[in-house]
């Protein structure tokens, strides 16, 4: 059980470190890769949290009735990877194409589904993995680890962006 707890904590830090910094850069990526205005990119990306808010209660109810938490975690992580790969590889290749906005919108919808699946299954798994009297400490450790990731990953992203875009000061000129 202890080993599974640490796997859940690792999934938490990796997942949220891939989601929250991505929210910061996604609009700029849409602007750079598809020549969207900031307003259009923001409108399209707003589908992500709205979709997640709409379906998370349904997925929580499904988890309560049917279980399948591990499967939900796997599917959610897989959908996030698909979204990130689409933004990194497909969107730059589709610049100027009618398919670019379609792929972007579809990827963002998938990310919203992912952001519903993972939290709906991850947080309820913690009480199943640790003794009730240690539950507060378990959540504290997970949040502590998560915040280390949220501290480190934006700096890593910034260093990578600076390395692949030497001398470019305008983020709208970034090559993602």
Where are these regions (language model features)?
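Helix-to-loop junctions at the C-terminal end of transmembrane segments
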Residues: 55-68, 161
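Extracytoplasmic gate region of multi-pass secondary transporters
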Residues: 2-52, 119, 123, 153-154
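A membrane-interface helix-boundary motif in multi-pass transporters
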Residues: 159-176
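Loop-to-transmembrane helix entry/capping segments in MFS-fold secondary transporters
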Residues: 38-39, 132-142
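C-terminal transmembrane helical hairpin of 12-TM major facilitator-type secondary transporters
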Residues: 69-122
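Transmembrane alpha-helical cores of Major Facilitator Superfamily
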Residues: 13, 46-50, 78, 140-148
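Helix-terminus/helix-capping segments at the ends of transmembrane helices and short amphipathic helices
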Residues: 27, 31, 63, 126-131, ...
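Small-residue (Gly/Pro/Ala) motifs that create kinks and tight helix-helix packing interfaces
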Residues: 27, 59, 153-161
């Amino acid at each position: 059980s202890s080993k599974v707890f640490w796997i859940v904590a690792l999934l938490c830090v990796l997942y949220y470190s891939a989601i929250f910094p991505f929210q910061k850069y996604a609009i700029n990526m849409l602007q750079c890769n598809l020549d969207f205005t900031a307003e259009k990119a923001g409108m399209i990306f707003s589908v992500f949290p709205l979709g997640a808010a709409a379906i998370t209660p349904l997925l929580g109810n499904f988890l309560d009735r049917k279980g399948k938490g591990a499967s939900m975690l796997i599917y959610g992580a897989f959908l996030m990877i698909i979204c990130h790969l689409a933004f990194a590889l497909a969107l730059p290749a589709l610049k100027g194409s009618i398919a670019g906005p379609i792929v972007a919108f579809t990827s963002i919808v998938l990310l919203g589904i992912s952001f519903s699946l993972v939290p709906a299954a991850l947080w309820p798994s913690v009480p199943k993995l640790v003794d009730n009297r240690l539950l507060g400490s378990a959540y504290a450790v997970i949040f502590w680890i998560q915040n280390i990731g949220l501290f480190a990953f934006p700096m890593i992203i910034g260093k990578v962006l600076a390395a692949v875009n030497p001398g470019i000061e305008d983020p709208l000129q970034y090559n993602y």
